């Protein structure tokens, strides 16, 4: 854990954008872009010599291109050997940064789950309280009906319906 804190606190090892990475690599190994530029220039000169029908100059530029490519390859290998330990440290740092991001993402996901669980429990408690209150009210309503006679209940439930009103109208009864 102390190693991780040391690496994360080191200002040399910080997250960087692709442009920053390009600039850093350009500063670390300036010979590689120089070799690439020399190769491109030799190819350009060979092309121009071919257009001018100067085969001697064209062959000389193709040889120069081969030398420039060899120089570039040598710069890549030498730079790789020279910066081997730093690249290894950077890879370890990037791995730790990814682990930290994954852990933060996991923690955020767990916090979200806990919040949803708390919300669900609150909803269930409110729902249970409402159902208990509803049960108490229905029990209170049942207690009121227990003291009444059953015939009164039937009379109350039976009212004048549409059919009764039509029959009464046909028979000529007035209410």
Curated annotation (Swiss-Prot):
Is Plastid found in the keyword set?
Answer: no
Stretches that traverse the bilayer:
30-46, 66-83
Against Gene3D superfamilies, the record matches this protein to: 6.10.140.1320
Q: How does it sit in the membrane?
A: Multi-pass membrane protein
Q: Cross-referenced InterPro entries, in alphabetical order?
A: Hypoxia_induced_domain (IPR007667), RCF1 (IPR050355)
What protein am I looking at?
A: Respiratory supercomplex factor 1-B, mitochondrial
Q: Where in the cell is it found?
A: Mitochondrion membrane
Self-association or partners: how does it assemble?
Answer: Associates with the respiratory chain complex III/complex IV supercomplex.
Pfam families recorded: HIG_1_N
Tell me the gene name: rcf1-B
The UniProt entry, under PANTHER family, shows: HIG1 DOMAIN FAMILY MEMBER 1A (PTHR12297:SF3), HYPOXIA-INDUCBILE GENE 1 HIG1 -RELATED (PTHR12297)
Q: Which PROSITE patterns does this entry report, sorted A to Z?
A: HIG1
Which spans of this chain does the record mark as coiled coil? 83-115
Residue ranges annotated for the HIG1 domain, each copy included:
3-94
- Keyword hit for Flavoprotein: no
Q: Which UniProt keywords apply?
A: Coiled coil, Membrane, Mitochondrion, Transmembrane, Transmembrane helix
Report the sequence similarity comment from the record: Belongs to the RCF1 family.
Any GO BP: mitochondrial respirasome assembly
What biological function has been recorded for the protein in this entry? Cytochrome c oxidase subunit which plays a role in assembly of respiratory supercomplexes.
GO cellular component terms listed in the entry, alphabetical order:
mitochondrial membrane
């Amino acid at each position: 854990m102390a190693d991780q804190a040391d690496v994360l606190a080191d200002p040399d090892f910080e997250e960087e954008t692709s442009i920053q990475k390009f600039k850093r690599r350009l500063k670390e190994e300036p010979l590689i872009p120089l070799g690439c530029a020399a190769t491109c220039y030799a190819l350009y000169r060979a092309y121009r010599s071919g257009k001018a029908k100067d085969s001697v100059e064209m062959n000389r530029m193709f040889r120069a291109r081969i030398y420039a490519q060899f120089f570039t390859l040598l710069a890549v290998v030498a730079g790789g050997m020279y910066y081997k330990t730093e690249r290894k440290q950077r890879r370890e740092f990037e791995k730790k940064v990814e682990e930290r991001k994954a852990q933060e993402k996991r923690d955020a996901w767990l916090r979200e789950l806990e919040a949803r669980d708390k919300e669900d429990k609150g909803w269930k408690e409110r729902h249970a309280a409402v159902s208990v209150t509803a049960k108490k009210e229905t029990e209170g309503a049942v207690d009121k009906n227990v003291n009444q006679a059953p015939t009164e209940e039937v009379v109350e439930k039976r009212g004048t319906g549409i059919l009764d009103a039509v029959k009464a109208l046909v028979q000529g009864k007035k209410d």
